[in-house]
């Protein structure tokens, strides 16, 4: 499992134990990480099955598309992401997502 969220998100929101971190974007302005594909290949390799996770599944979908186009044959997006979709009150962690499904996670 590769977490593509920013370092700040992982630190302040939580993370999946033993996940690998390769940020799709960096900082609070979410600037695209130009080294994403090289870092992903270095940390995981192109021949492995890769699950990508972000906050809601949107960035990880973009990352999965980019990785597939770059030759990562078995790359998948984790639907709903770590925090899930916004509910009718514009809040996450209420209706779906990794944490809502009570899957393992930690917070520093």
Predicted features and spans:
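Short hydrophobic beta-strand that contains or immediately precedes a catalytic carboxylate
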Residues: 1-5
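Rhodanese-like catalytic fold shared by cysteine-dependent sulfurtransferases
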Residues: 8-49, 60-108
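Short, surface-exposed ligand- or partner-binding patches at beta-edge/loop junctions that are enriched
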Residues: 52-53
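Conserved G/P- and acidic residue-centered "switch" motifs that form tight phosphate/ATP-binding loops
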Residues: 57
